[in-house]
Amino acid sequence: MKSSEVRQKFLEFFETHGHTIVPSSPLVPGNDPTLLFTNAGMVQFKDVFLGQDKRPYVRAASAQRCVRAGGKHNDLENVGYTARHHTFFEMLGNFSFGDYFKRNAIRFAWEFLTDILKIPRERLWITVYAEDDEAADIWLNEVGIDSSRFTRIATQDNFWQMGDTGPCGPCSEIFYDHGPEIPGGPPGTPNADGDRYVEIWNLVFMQYNRDSAGTLHPLPRPSVDTGMGLERISAVMQQVHSNYEIDLFQQLIKAAARATNTTDLSSSSLNVIADHIRACSFLIADGVIPGNEGRGYVLRRIIRRAIRHGYKLGQKQPFFHQLVEDLASVMGQAYPELMEAKTRVSAVLKQEEERFAETLENGMQVLEAALRRGDRMLDGETLFRLYDTFGFPLDLTADIARERGIAIDEAGFDQAMEQQRERARTTSKFIMQEAIAYSGPSTTFHGYESLRQEGQVLAIYKEGSRVEFIEAGDEAVIVLDKTPFYAESGGQVGDSGELLAANGTFAVADTQKIQADVFGHKGLLRSGRLATGDAVLAEVDRAARARTERNHSVTHLMHKALREVLGHHVQQKGSLVDANKTRFDFAHNQPVTDAEIRKVEMLVNAEILANAATEARMMAIEDAKKSGAMMLFGEKYSDEVRVLDIGTSRELCGGTHVKRTGDIGLFKIVAESGVAAGVRRVEAVTGERALTYIQEQELQLQRVAAAVKAQPQDAAARITQILDNVKHLERELGRMKSKLASSQGDDFADRVREIKGVKVLAVCLEEADPKTLREAVDKFKNKFKSCVTVLAAVEDGKVKLIAGVTSDLTARLKAGDLVNFVAQQVGGKGGGRADLAQAGGTVPDSLPAALESVASWVEQHL
């Protein structure tokens, strides 16, 4: 039975038993920014199990795409070498949300395995949690399992929990016996780690809630979460022991063998490549881009591991991306999203392959040299050099070292990494340069409601040290109890403005966070005196704040528009919002086209014209997730978050924003560029700056049109016409120069010398460029058949030299040696092939003597 048939039979079986078939969720969890990847079928139902979400169904079944690589579930080093380790797998699962419980869950599983798949009962072994008498009774007395194939397990292997607190409960696991020819004992025995008995289905019964004291309380509506690996059950149905022997993998292994020109289909490297193309393709299809952090770095590690195994098989050219088409033919019917994204997936993989190819060869040479030293451990310095200089992820180097029986100094690598981070920290710009150790009350921010706020000076810092007062001309950092000044956060720069006291005026140039809830106002006391305890009127620069708010609000609209135009793989990678512009970095693997930029501009300006009201609300993080607010992976959010609705955008944001989208005025993208592999950057302006930019562009167009004597709308066509004329004239000029050089060559016939039967010519041609010199050399070589030629030209005080030697003489005379000999006399150097070489120089006055010396050089070398 094919894997696709097993998947289909599973879904059909549970659909006939009242389950709603729910499509696989993306590999990037949408409801949990703290989770790296979707690693189980229950992830998309987590909020339902926690009681934070309610679905229109109480029974569900799915075939869920999963990735386990990085973090807790890191099987990467074993993938390809064992029978059942994978980075990507499919989990078949059925779920009950307060509907059926143990009895039906067990009966469904048993019926599917024995009646639908026809697996012999005597091949199945059952385990339950030691204290779960209810499940034991159902298995033994209702299903009728032979007690000799039944085990109670007292360890946590048979007790599942979501975390230290929350829903939890006992498990019942179903194992398949692959037969006595495979080593290993039954579950629960000392030999259980063998491969004979393989877990194929886990039934989790969520019946308790564990409180902070560790006490278990019965849940009012117990639920069921089950998971069965498609690859494992397919191996059972196809009567093979290794997952890599099933039909799905065999097709990919054969494709990998074709792409790497490999004939040995049992190679572990082919297993690695076949596994990794699944993980990489689906991750990219779901919006992950190779990068240097988070999900992007896990993806990059997997890609580079696959490339390295191709290299090991002898494939030095990009090959991995070719397998996307093969994967689509295998899994595209079950997952149409892969078919839709396959062109983009292939392009991303090819780009990453080409990027790594630039350093792989050199990195392997460094690694091979280190491994040949014979040390039992590869040192941390080499590990870090391979990582930092050649892009070798640590686990890739560890893989290669392990194949040679050599350990790695991971602690030394970590130390080298920390030293680099420390260097980066000390050399990076940090606006609040003084090390301020503040202890005291926090700052209350009032800047959402008002730009003027009365407050009191809590502390003053001068050159990093706390002082009681400052005087006119002093630079300092002021801490207030209440402030309207926004402190730099979330990409938005800090506010500027003034602190007005009875005895002085303090100009605030920037506002930074000293601590999470303590704001430092950095600036200069322009006049008077300011002391701790003084009352001040804090007033933000209204014009600068307004421009910053426009730019911040438009960033949200632009982010949404970019996702709409380019795809949902677009994810924010960084931003900078100030009074002049917004700069936005995002995941995307190719330049944004002019047409795409225009679409983004149209969408954003349409939102501005709609003049929709902006609404900010505080809500619980779980409510924010359910509302669909965009969150950033890796960000740490508090239990209560600020959700901003602006136009059709909804994001978590603590920044300051316009009241209505119309306040933005106008939006214009002014630059687009790449900042790293898979990361693009756009810069945009708003309001009067957008208008000024457009007017400047219009003025430039008018000037260009005037210069080419055309109307602005005809300028492009006129310039194209002029450029075509220039190209025509350049070709004519080239022909004239060739003709001139040819005629000069004829004039120099009397300058040809004969030395030991070899014709030698060394002359300077007037008005000749390098192309003309080469043509003239070829002409002389064709004319004299056996000759040595050195031709020179002088332009703008620079000497150009070309030397030619006919093929019958190159065993004795090298053009590269000759041209270098001449070039050294005119202040230059050069080189090239034995038959043709070129050089340059900076001393044209020495050229006549240098050319005169050619004859003697040839005579010496013949």
Swiss-Prot record:
Pfam families (UniProt xref): DHHA1 (PF02272), tRNA-synt_2c (PF01411), tRNA_SAD (PF07973)
Domain of life of the native organism: Bacteria
PROSITE patterns linked to this entry: AA_TRNA_LIGASE_II_ALA (PS50860)
Keyword DNA-binding: no
The protein's Enzyme Commission number: 6.1.1.7
The protein's required cofactors: Zn(2+)
Catalysed reaction, written as an equation: tRNA(Ala) + L-alanine + ATP = L-alanyl-tRNA(Ala) + AMP + diphosphate
Cofactor: how bound: Binds 1 zinc ion per subunit.
A GO molecular-function descriptor: alanine-tRNA ligase activity
SMART domains xrefs: tRNA_SAD
Protein name per Swiss-Prot or TrEMBL: Alanine--tRNA ligase
Organism: Nitrosospira multiformis (strain ATCC 25196 / NCIMB 11849 / C 71)
